[in-house]
Regions:
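Charged low-complexity interaction tracts in eukaryotic proteins
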Residues: 3-26, 76-122
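Positively charged, polyanion-binding regions of nucleic-acid-associated proteins
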Residues: 25-50, 55-58, 74
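Short acidic DE-rich linear segments
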Residues: 126-127
Length: 127
């Protein structure tokens, strides 16, 4: 799991996708939620060309608000993720991460974000 020190360093080194706004970070666990979601996705050689509201999908999975800035930092910190939000090198066939990834992330599931039914956003579930 990412440490607070790693996340703070990531915040300093991130080139944020929303240039016109100040980065918004409510809690370092939001970065951890985004990181775990990105980590579960199949990686591709190039960035996707299809724009998706990834932050909303991540929020529903993690049960908590996650800002675009949090996703930007998570992508910066992940050694296998490249690109700029929402165009990362992840498969368009999304994988629903296992909820076990959020064990120890105290802010997960603390807000009323819920996943949509079925596999609407996902092609497969992580085991």
């Amino acid at each position: 799991m990412l440490s607070d020190a790693e996340i703070e360093e990531g915040k300093r080194n991130t080139s944020y996708s929303l240039k016109q706004e100040e980065p918004l970070h409510e809690h370092n666990d939001c970065v951890r939620i985004a990181y775990e979601w990105l980590d579960a996705q199949a990686k591709t050689k190039g960035v996707t060309r299809k724009a998706r509201a990834l932050k909303h999908i991540i929020e529903q999975w993690g049960g908590r608000y996650v800002s675009t800035s949090d996703v930007d930092v998570a992508a910066t910190l992940h050694p296998d993720i490249h690109g700029t939000y929402p165009f990362f090198n992840i498969s368009s066939r999304l994988t629903r991460p296992n909820k076990r990834r959020l064990n120890g992330v105290t802010q997960a599931f603390t807000q009323s974000y819920v996943e949509s039914d079925g596999l609407a956003d996902y092609k497969t579930d992580e085991t």
